[in-house]
């Protein structure tokens, strides 16, 4: 994936799309670290496990349930991988500075497309998960292993909490995507 340097409020900030899924995202992060990157704010969208979370609502990930394989190559087995507290604090401070409502969230990281079954959604909700995505646990694990600062900001996208999937038009929410990108840049500058 191409990497870009973006001028954000007079400061150069790196930008790269890590792809979809834990293995590829981890590889992109490894390459960025090899190039000297030490502070990362990841941003994007994720599915919600509770339809009461409005599309576009922001979620600061504090940790992720490890239901993928990549993270286990970086950290000993455990149920969760955590975001770096400094990155979480930078994200929360950024959002609060703008008066933007948000939730501190646990994500469910899966590597299986189309397998957010009702039973799995119930299980993950019982574990405290508010959203599902495909990279966070692996990225948190790589960051811990490589001793860098990494956090993640998501906007609430599709809803997988019911018997039928509800896209909620999340792929067309360009304003939400632009918002999380700008907020991620700002939070990164706080690190």
Q: Which residues are covered by each model-predicted region?
A:
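Active-site rim beta-loop-alpha module in soluble metabolic enzymes
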Residues: 78-126
């Amino acid at each position: 994936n191409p990497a870009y340097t973006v001028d954000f409020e007079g400061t150069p900030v790196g930008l790269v799309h890590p792809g979809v899924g834990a293995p590829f995202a981890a590889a992109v992060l490894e390459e960025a670290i090899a190039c000297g990157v030490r502070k990362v704010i990841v941003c994007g969208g994720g599915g919600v496990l509770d339809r009461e979370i409005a599309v576009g609502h922001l979620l600061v990930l504090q940790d992720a349930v490890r239901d993928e394989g990549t993270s286990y190559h970086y950290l000993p087995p455990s149920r969760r991988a955590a975001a770096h507290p400094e990155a979480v604090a930078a994200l929360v401070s950024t959002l609060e500075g703008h008066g933007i409502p948000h939730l501190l969230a646990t994500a469910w990281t899966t590597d299986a497309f189309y397998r957010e079954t009702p039973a799995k959604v119930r299980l993950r909700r019982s574990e405290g998960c508010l959203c599902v995505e495909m990279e966070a646990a692996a990225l948190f694990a790589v960051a811990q292993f490589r001793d860098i600062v990494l956090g993640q900001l998501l906007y609430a996208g599709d809803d997988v909490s019911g018997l039928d999937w509800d896209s909620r038009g999340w792929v067309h929410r360009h304003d939400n995507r632009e918002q999380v990108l700008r907020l991620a840049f700002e939070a990164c500058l706080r690190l």
